[in-house]
Amino acid sequence: MNGKIALEEHFATEETLMDSAGFVPDKDWPELRSRLLDIQDRRVRLMDEHGIETMILSLNAPAVQAIADSTRANETARRANDFLAEQVAKQPTRFRGFAALPMQDPELAARELERCVKELGFVGALVNGFSQDNRSAVPLYYDMAQYWPFWETVQALDVPFYLHPRNPLPSDARIYDGHAWLLGPTWAFGQETAVHALRLMGSGLFDKYPALKIILGHMGEGLPYSMWRIDHRNAWIKTTPKYPAKRKIVDYFNENFYLTTSGNFRTQTLIDAILEIGADRILFSTDWPFENIDHAADWFENTSISEADRKKIGWGNAQNLFKLNR
């Protein structure tokens, strides 16, 4: 299947490269390093070999989100975004860009997103989970009141916001003590991101800004399979709603969220996601360079779904969501 659009596809700059070093054994680091730093060569050859027309590129994790000084976070984000814009300009039919944002300061983040969309031609933002800020005693999650003006900007710009995982801080990760194998993409990434997404849904954010579009990777970070139970238990005792939002959690999930297949190449999982959120809200992705492009493409092209859904997920939904001309 040619013409696929992939949208959780990472790169690194020399400045952010080492943030990815801990995700593979030392012996595999040279390979991952090479993959992260390459954009124009091997990546494009693999795209050609496996029918990927366009990649939407994003900075590796946690990068900007782990820089506790907001001024330095902003400077790092701007350098990464300028570098990405230069790379996209070399092959604008093959690459598009997601903005990295200094979410430590909502006003700076809104300004940088506006710059990236209006001046650099980016199609949205990808943010690596919560942000650290040396002015705050707690991690910053984006349902907090100080972020609502930022979300107003996102809605006004009419671009998607990809909420990408990161590990919890050590102070919040005691449950993983002695079980480091559960950290990262094995489990902790999904759990951390799912809770963050639920915070957004329950906060009332989507009542105030109903046109927001949030993307979750890895087939929804486990959320599609929990929607019924979340709403069922919240409604079990007939009292005032336990969260500020006006509607059921599943309503926001189905109306404000999109999912990608990044790093979750399992047919049963895809079918379950289709049954929960619908094929119109699922998009193909690979999670390169942390997953292999051939694994993602070979699975997707042979998975047991209808050809109509394969076209939607493979490229049609992304074309519509990002307003891409083909």
UniProtKB/Swiss-Prot annotation:
Pathway connected to this protein: Aromatic compound metabolism
Catalytic activity: 2,6-dihydroxybenzoate + H(+) = resorcinol + CO2; 2,3-dihydroxybenzoate + H(+) = catechol + CO2
Known cofactor(s): Mn(2+)
Domain of life: Bacteria
Protein role: Involved in the gamma-resorcylate (2,6-dihydroxybenzoate) catabolism. Catalyzes the reversible decarboxylation of gamma-resorcylate to resorcinol. Also catalyzes the decarboxylation of 2,3-dihydroxybenzoate to catechol, 2,4,6-trihydroxybenzoate to benzene-1,3,5-triol, and 2,6-dihydroxy-4-methylbenzoate to 5-methylbenzene-1,3-diol.
Classification via PANTHER family: 2-AMINO-3-CARBOXYLMUCONATE-6-SEMIALDEHYDE DECARBOXYLASE, AMIDOHYDROLASE-RELATED DOMAIN-CONTAINING PROTEIN-RELATED
The protein, known as: Gamma-resorcylate decarboxylase
Organism: Polaromonas sp. (strain JS666 / ATCC BAA-500)
